[in-house]
């Protein structure tokens, strides 16, 4: 719109114009309609005030968004490292749990196997009855188990049970700790899902993009469109202010034209007495338009020539149709600003949501790292310490179980070998007795032959020989007596003796012909075992030797 012209200080009379000029100039009613339209157009000042508020609020939103981006980016970079460390710790704790559980399971299987072997051997000892010939006749029947003291086994079982219980307790505490750790991780994952949801929402609906691929990978957001949007808002606001100034100039020109028209002064004062709301307001961004309008209304009219008046009216005629277009443009611009401002606010709110989600994760991690994480790590270390201690005890107990099994299994094998030894000794005794019987028979023959020869000599020559020529000439043949000597102890202990025969001269013949008795009461007592027991013992010893040979070969 063209700028207004200065007016004369008094109403210019109509006689100053000729009839042609009077017909070409608009009537007062037309000028009043222009003034009313200009007055209505000043209502657009509320849009200008709103534009100024939007620009101010957008600057505040930008400042807050920059702070949020910076803080969120800083926290997010720290979170990435903390999360990696946290999952590394959880993985290590889980490895400790799995490793300990596997080792403990293997140890229990080995213990169960060793204990089963020991119990089987003890059952065999209970089921193996000592043959009565090994024991005194008045003694109650006994099994091999009666010769075993199981207190050592019971004490070993109690020790192993204590180690297993302590390990189970430590493992249960570790499992509980790990479950709590997992709950913490689930809570953190939930917080991270909130973060990712907020990020996706911002990325899909707003102009928030990642500054680079690495930034995208780390989830750090940066503002790309907000500064441009605010520049657009500022441009709209500036243009709206310019348009409003044009409307004000148009209004002032209408007031001046009406006042310079005959009879228009009172009408102008009447119309301008009730200005649209907001015209009298002011702030740092906008001047007090109401004061300027009032100053123009109350200012005295400057003298104006006919040419100046005609020029002013021509400007009004030209500008009046454009006033509505200016108002529409201001309306369009404020609508555009509201739309942009909604995007700015939404972007700020999205960043605020991301920031809150990040702070939530950070707070959770900080609380976890400062209070609960050390306890989870300590619990894993405690389990490792307990398991190392008890594993040594369990391994020692496993060795003791194996030793006891070997001892009792050796006892079983030794008893079988004892029966074989008894059979061997009895066979040797039988061979000895046979030698004795054969020798006795030969000695008896020699004795009889010698006695007969002596008797023949005595009968033939005895009458001729004096009795004192040889005292032994009339003696009977000597007798040979076998004496059984106890073998004593194999380690060289004292040896007892028990003669089998002490015959007198008159008993010799009978004793000599009686042979040698193999009674068990004489010399060494050898149990008389049934043949089937010896054969069964031999089969078992042979089977054990075969297994031992195979193991040695492997």
From Swiss-Prot:
Q: Which molecular-function annotation in GO is an example for this chain?
A: protein kinase activator activity
* Major localisation: cytoplasm
Q: Among the entry's GO cellular component annotations, what is one? A: Atg1/ULK1 kinase complex
UniProt feature coiled coil, ranges: 327-353
Q: What superkingdom does the record give?
A: Eukaryota
Q: Where in the cell is it found?
A: Cytoplasm; Preautophagosomal structure membrane
What membrane topology does this protein have? Peripheral membrane protein
Q: Which PANTHER family does the UniProt entry name for this protein?
A: AUTOPHAGY-RELATED PROTEIN 17
Question: What is this protein's function per UniProt?
Answer: Autophagy-specific protein that functions in response to autophagy-inducing signals as a scaffold to recruit other ATG proteins to organize pre-autophagosomal structure (PAS) formation. Modulates the timing and magnitude of the autophagy response, such as the size of the sequestering vesicles. Plays particularly a role in pexophagy and nucleophagy.
Q: What is this protein called?
A: Autophagy-related protein 17
Its gene is atg17
